[in-house]
Amino acid sequence: MANLILKQSLIILLIIYSTPILSSQARILRTYRPTTMGDMDSQVLLRELGIDLSKFKGQDERRFLVDSERVSPGGPDPQHH
């Protein structure tokens, strides 16, 4: 009988303490950032990611984003079973 009362008490306390958490709402933060990625300028995004664009001046500005030595895979090896 004592175990049943203890279990019921714990369940009631759990419900009471979890109610504020379940009913809480998210707060909207006002920021200067655009809401969608389509509106964001790539230079702004790179600056926010911590990439210093001044290091890449004098070179092709997009070259550091794409590796020109990359080789596309040729598919499955015909010798492999």
Swiss-Prot record:
Sugar-modified residues: P76
Keyword Cell cycle: no
InterPro entries: CLAVATA3-CLE (IPR039617)
Residue positions, PTM Hydroxyproline: P73, P76
Stretch forming the signal peptide: 1-26
GO biological process, one term: cell-cell signaling involved in cell fate commitment
GO cellular component: apoplast
Keyword Flavoprotein: no
UniProt keywords, alphabetically: Developmental protein, Differentiation, Glycoprotein, Hydroxylation, Secreted, Signal
Similarity remark: Belongs to the CLV3/ESR signal peptide family.
UniProt-recorded name of the protein: CLAVATA3/ESR (CLE)-related protein 6
Organism annotation: Arabidopsis thaliana (Mouse-ear cress)
